[in-house]
């Protein structure tokens, strides 16, 4: 029996790389895709096939997927993992930066789905796994652009699940919480560039401090990869998998608390994070007393 074929975007680092390794170890023929092909040499060494893709370039998407279909003859699993977070106030983030955020996180995902669907429909089977975030259900301060893109993925996935059921194609969403990856450094760098000064500087510091503390308790990318394994390999996958530090707690509280009560809860969490950092800073800056002279 031929191996099932899986495609993983954003395969050059963190979560995507771990997903590719796990699917490969579970017996799939895996194609890891990224703009940074030189950072996937370790995947090549394992036997995972790597290819260039720029999900924001629709011609690149069509060309790469066409090459894979020509080589493998089928596509069983598409994992839409490529994406990034650009934090900053709506007012201060350049609209072109916001558009690019949506082009990568939403329209790139949609183009990939469009491109693999003819093959999956012909097979009368397939599985589309969209890596969203708890930010697709829980809004973060200064994260309107990123949060908006992830809320979009949640809704798109629900509608797509209804569309594709008739063809035997499953649609699954994975919602990571706090995960150790380079996502935070990129998101906070964008935040500092756009809103580090000016009227939103206080809010920028607040959310930056919160993410710094949350990162200390974040989960390894492996937990996301395991969820993708379940989504890809189960006969009857769940429609959603929430994984990682804080995911279940925050999603549960978001469901049961009224909007303003949840806002107050999140504000309290961020205040608590700032107190923790201030205490740590004070301890680091504390001058040891001189030894007593006897």
Feature map (PLM): residue ranges:
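A short, exposed helix-loop element centered on a Lys and neighboring polar residues
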Residues: 113-114, 158
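Conserved glycine-rich cofactor-binding loop
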Residues: 12-13
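C-terminal beta-strand-loop-alpha-helix "lid" module of Rossmann-like NAD(P)-dependent dehydrogenases
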Residues: 166-215
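Active-site helix of classical SDR
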Residues: 113, 149-152
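Substrate-binding pocket helix/loop in short-chain dehydrogenase/reductase
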Residues: 89-90, 94-99
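Residue(s) in the substrate-gating loop at a strand-loop-helix junction
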Residues: 133
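The beta1-alpha1 cofactor-binding region of Rossmann-like NAD(H)/NADP(H)-dependent oxidoreductases
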Residues: 53-63, 95
């Amino acid at each position: 029996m031929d191996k099932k074929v899986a495609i993983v975007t954003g395969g050059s680092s963190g979560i995507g790389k771990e997903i590719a390794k796990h699917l490969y170890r579970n017996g799939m023929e895996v194609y890891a895709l990224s703009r940074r092909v030189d950072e996937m040499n370790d995947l090549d060494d394992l036997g995972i096939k790597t290819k260039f893709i720029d999900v924001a370039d629709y011609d690149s998407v069509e060309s790469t997927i066409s090459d894979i279909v020509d080589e493998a003859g089928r596509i069983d699993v598409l994992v839409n993992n490529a994406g990034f977070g650009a934090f900053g106030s709506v007012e201060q983030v350049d609209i072109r930066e916001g558009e690019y955020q949506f082009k990568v996180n939403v329209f790139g995902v949609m183009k990939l789905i469009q491109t693999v669907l003819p093959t999956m429909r012909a097979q009368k089977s397939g599985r589309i796994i969209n890596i969203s975030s708890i930010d697709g259900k829980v809004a973060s301060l200064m994260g309107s652009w990123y949060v908006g893109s992830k809320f979009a993925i949640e809704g798109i996935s629900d509608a797509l699940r209804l569309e594709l059921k008739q063809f035997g194609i499953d649609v699954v969403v994975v919602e990571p919480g706090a995960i150790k990856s380079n996502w935070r450094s990129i998101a906070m760098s964008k935040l500092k560039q756009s809103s580090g000064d000016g009227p939103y500087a206080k809010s920028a510091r607040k959310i930056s401090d919160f993410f710094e503390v949350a990162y200390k308790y974040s989960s390894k990318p492996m937990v996301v990869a395991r969820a993708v394994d379940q989504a890809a390999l189960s006969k009857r996958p769940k429609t959603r998998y929430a994984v990682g530090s804080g995911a279940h707690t925050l999603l549960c509280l978001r469901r049961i608390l009224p909007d303003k009560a949840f806002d107050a809860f999140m504000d309290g969490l961020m205040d608590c994070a700032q107190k923790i950092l201030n205490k740590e800073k004070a301890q680091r800056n504390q001058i040891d007393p001189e030894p007593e002279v006897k």
